[in-house]
């Protein structure tokens, strides 16, 4: 566990320890990797990155103290944050996450232009017949009207985009 207790202290710690501080990520080009690259650019430091084959192995090593910090999606980390297994400093979205309501945004914490948000998609192979894609879309719309599904999304700190931004 790092000594800082808030984002301001964390950024000061990173700057003071930039030559030895390490971060883990879910793989080169992953959201967690890009988030850390953007953060380092924003605060003007370079740290050593440790790539993993997914969030699971990275989270295991974060919990085991193999590296110092990590940026990842709330869908992957909310359980560990709520259980107190990891210390969270902020969310990178524009708005606070309802399931982590006491966690500030980086914007609130002084990084005014910093935002990282991710999205998840449902995919089918190229050439999937239109009736199958249409049925999949219709089933997804039905699922998104289910209060239990929406509550689970909220519990994980995520939610669907407005319908006008969806594609079949």
State what each model feature region is:
Residues 1-57, 106, 119-152:
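Hinge/capping helix and adjacent helix->loop/strand transition within the periplasmic-binding protein
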Residues 6, 51, 65-66, 73, ...:
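Conserved functional loop/turn residues at catalytic and ligand-binding sites
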Residues 18-19, 62, 67, 86:
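Short, high-confidence coil segments that cap the C-terminus of an alpha-helix
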Residues 36, 61-63, 81-84, 136:
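Hydrophobic residues within well-ordered alpha-helices
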Residues 40-42, 69-103:
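A ligand-binding cleft/hinge motif common to bilobed small-molecule-binding domains
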Residues 50-60, 64, 73-76, 166:
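Short helix-initiation/N-cap motifs at beta->coil->alpha
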Residues 90-126, 156, 162-164:
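Periplasmic-binding protein-like
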Residues 134, 150-168:
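Mature extracytoplasmic/periplasmic domains
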């Amino acid at each position: 566990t790092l000594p800082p207790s808030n984002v301001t202290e964390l950024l000061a710690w990173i700057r003071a320890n930039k030559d030895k501080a390490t971060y883990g990520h879910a793989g080169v080009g992953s959201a967690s990797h890009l988030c850390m690259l953007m953060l380092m650019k924003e605060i003007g430091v370079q740290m050593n990155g440790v790539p993993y084959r997914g969030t699971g192995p990275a989270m295991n090593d974060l919990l085991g103290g193999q590296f110092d910090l990590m940026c990842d999606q709330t869908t992957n980390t909310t359980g560990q944050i709520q259980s107190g297994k990891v210390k969270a400093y902020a969310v990178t979205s524009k708005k606070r996450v309802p399931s982590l309501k006491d966690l500030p945004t980086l914007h609130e914490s002084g990084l005014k232009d910093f935002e990282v948000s991710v999205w998840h998609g449902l995919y089918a192979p190229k050439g999937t017949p239109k009736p199958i894609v249409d049925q999949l879309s219709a089933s997804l719309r039905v699922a998104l009207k289910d209060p239990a599904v929406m509550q689970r999304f909220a519990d994980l700190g995520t939610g669907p985009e407005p319908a006008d931004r969806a594609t079949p």
